[in-house]
Amino acid sequence: MTKDKEPRKDHTSGRKNFGGEPPVVCSFCGRTSHEVNSMVAGPNAFICDRCILSSVEILRKEISAIRHPEKTSEPAFQPRLKSPVNIKESLDQYVIGQERAKKSLSVAVYNHYKRIDAHEWTAEDEVEIEKSNILLIGPTGTGKTLLAQTLANLLEVPFTIADATSLTEAGYVGDDVETILARLLHASDFNLERAERGIIYVDEIDKIARKSANVSITRDVSGEGVQQALLKILEGSVVGVPPKGGRKHPEQQLININTKNILFICGGAFEGLDKIIARRVSKSSMGFGSKVKDKQTGYDPEILKLVTQDDLHEYGLIPEFIGRLPVMSALDPLDASALRNILVEPKNALVKQYKRLFEMDGVELEFTDEALDKVVEIAIERGTGARALRSVLENVMIDIMFELPTLKDVQKCIITSETIDKISGPVYEKKDGKERLTA
């Protein structure tokens, strides 16, 4: 009898495995005894401590909902934790290029939500994993905002975008940093638990760099002062937020938000940062990449990948602020080939969107290769990357979409390079196939 009981004690010990026996596997979640603190054995089945606690929480909520139906609310959403490979594959469907940035983001996001999941099971004497906020560096229109937005959609977590240029220190004209959290709360439909697991993208973060390396007697209310104000919410703290946004006032009721599990992604063009890096890095150590400059941006597309915290400090970010953004990734400028692919390849590519709109009117939309090349050419001239593609197409398509619903018997609309240049309108094909009309 003693020998029969002894293995069961080993099985329920969780992390230990005496006698060289294979680890026990939880029948519910599949975790092994090495991954949990304890394992309870039953007839032909095992259950780990994590599944037990999860079951208790589920039952507690169900009982509470029965006893207090008026207090029943949507349960906190736990993002489905996908592997970095799966996250990147999902990003690939919407974002063209930027392979390095997508890998960095995938790993950072995976570790962030794994950290949240593991926090409840971490003993006080175990290693606590710090938050992996992210800094994206790259020219305008390279996909910084799109990457953050796509990640939030993929994980189905609340998401909001804030413009750093609108932020000022408390007491000055402009937005407090707390307004960022208020927007996230709105995005979560005031579900506090969901908001506390959301993602915030702070754009134009380079614009709050310290204006001068010299200490001034005048306050830098939109530069270093904002960096100091952002520190508190970046590192994780409980912040009182006005539910309707705007400035705080003494008589206003505040909602306390814990930012410990909110992922912050900051992005900026950081114009001139490449020159700071170039001064630090000798030509010999920069290698072959140092001689190749991007035609649109005028800087070496590889040089930003060499950025260090010291470079960012020289640029104007304070060390404490840089330290709150441990994951840094530089995005590549988009060349003509990448812009052309962005037009047609992503799951929600602009060309696909317009084709779907025309399809709703029973008309097939076609872009000639020359037309797409012309769109890319104009976008490159504007110098705003992928952002220019939509404005170029919208400028052309607005008149066509205005008159299309009133045209009869049209089955196909062909956009040519002349259409993009506004030399002539599109070519319409009628349903009988015999008549071609040029607008």
Swiss-Prot record:
Zn(2+) binds at C26, C29, C48, C51. It comes from the Bacteria. Keywords: ATP-binding, Chaperone, Metal-binding, Nucleotide-binding, Zinc. InterPro entries: AAA+_ATPase (IPR003593), ATP-dep_Clp_protease_ClpX (IPR050052), ATPase_AAA_core (IPR003959), Clp_ATPase_C (IPR019489), Clp_protease_ATP-bd_su_ClpX (IPR004487), ClpX_bact (IPR046425), P-loop_NTPase (IPR027417), Znf_CppX_C4 (IPR010603). GO terms for molecular function: ATP binding; ATP hydrolysis activity; ATP-dependent protein folding chaperone; protein dimerization activity; unfolded protein binding; zinc ion binding. ATP binds at P139, T140, G141, T142, G143, K144, T145, L146. The keyword Protease does not apply. It holds the Pfam family zf-C4_ClpX. One of its GO terms (biological process) is cell division. Residues 13-67 form the ClpX-type ZB domain. GO terms for cellular component: HslUV protease complex. PANTHER family: ATP-DEPENDENT CLP PROTEASE ATP-BINDING SUBUNIT CLPX-LIKE, MITOCHONDRIAL, ATP-DEPENDENT CLP PROTEASE ATP-BINDING SUBUNIT CLPX-LIKE, MITOCHONDRIAL-RELATED. Belongs to the ClpX chaperone family. ATP-dependent specificity component of the Clp protease. It directs the protease to specific substrates. Can perform chaperone functions in the absence of ClpP. Component of the ClpX-ClpP complex. Forms a hexameric ring that, in the presence of ATP, binds to fourteen ClpP subunits assembled into a disk-like structure with a central cavity, resembling the structure of eukaryotic proteasomes. This is ATP-dependent Clp protease ATP-binding subunit ClpX. It comes from Chlorobaculum parvum (strain DSM 263 / NCIMB 8327).
